[in-house]
């Protein structure tokens, strides 16, 4: 079964926890995915790289230093070595012992929580090995049906889609294009992940008409406040776009804040679904 990323199919916007619910739990961990679900998210975005033994692990940085008690490149460590690291204590002592998950483990949790998952390719060194490893992880059609592979590198997305039947891909863009549909079609993309800074309602309508879904990122609440002070006026414009059905998925680091904002904007509540972290 393939799970839709389109508002027209789901009937309500997907709330997406960026790296999980990363303002309340350590990013890119199973705890962060559970925390996103608990606050009403039906989607999460995670980042992935390769280990030394060519296993795909969920990690944003190429180095382990920032989010674990380990040092050096993830690609220099075996999966067993990576699994021995503490990926939670840096965030809060309550998460001591949290481990870096594999992509397969993250997808399994998405099945259990009935979520979809946007998987960013962060691998830079050995994309051939990454593609091969990904094909193994996504060998089951049910797993592919919950996944959208995303990247800034649209060429990589086109390549990986050609190798894995039925795989959906989303290109991340930080610029405004004169013809975003052409940009998406050039790399056979199913989704564009568009910065709010460059969001254009007419482009969104054209993308939807072409069958391409749209994800936008709402940043952290403090960044949102700073944007308002700078005159970007997202508080007024984003609710209009949400009510008009122009955005299929809205992601953010604080899922409860995101849920409250979307609920207030659209009149559709997103109540918590489970135990909150903290």
Regions found by a protein language model. Give the residues of each.
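Phosphate-group recognition and catalysis centered on beta-loop-alpha active-site segments
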Residues: 1-278
């Amino acid at each position: 079964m393939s799970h839709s990323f389109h508002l027209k199919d789901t009937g309500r916007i997907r709330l997406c926890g960026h790296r999980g619910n990363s303002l309340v739990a350590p990013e890119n961990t199973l705890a962060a995915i559970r925390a996103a679900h608990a606050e009403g998210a039906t989607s999460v975005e995670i980042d992935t790289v390769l280990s030394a033994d060519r296993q795909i692990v969920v990690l944003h940085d190429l180095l382990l230093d920032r989010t674990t008690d380990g040092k050096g490149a993830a690609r220099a460590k075996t999966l067993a070595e990576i699994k021995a690291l503490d990926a939670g204590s840096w965030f809060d002592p309550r998460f001591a012992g949290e481990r870096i998950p594999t992509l397969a483990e993250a997808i399994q949790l998405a099945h259990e929580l009935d979520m979809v998952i946007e998987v960013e390719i962060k691998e830079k060194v050995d994309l051939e090995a990454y593609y091969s490893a990904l094909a193994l992880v996504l060998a089951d059609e049910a797993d592919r049906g919950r996944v959208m592979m995303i990247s800034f590198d649209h060429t990589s997305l086109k390549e990986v889609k050609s190798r894995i039947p039925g795989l959906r891909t989303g290109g991340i863009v930080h610029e405004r294009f004169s013809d975003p549909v052409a940009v998406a079609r050039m790399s056979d993309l199913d989704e564009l992940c568009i910065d709010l800074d460059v969001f254009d309602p007419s482009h969104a309508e054209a993308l939807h008409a072409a069958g391409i879904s749209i994800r936008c990122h709402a940043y952290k609440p403090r960044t949102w406040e700073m944007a308002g002070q700078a005159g970007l006026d997202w508080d007024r414009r984003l609710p209009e776009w949400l009510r008009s059905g122009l955005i299929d998925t809205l992601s953010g680091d604080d899922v409860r804040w995101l849920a409250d904002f979307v609920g207030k904007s659209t009149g559709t509540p997103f109540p918590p679904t489970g135990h909150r972290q903290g």
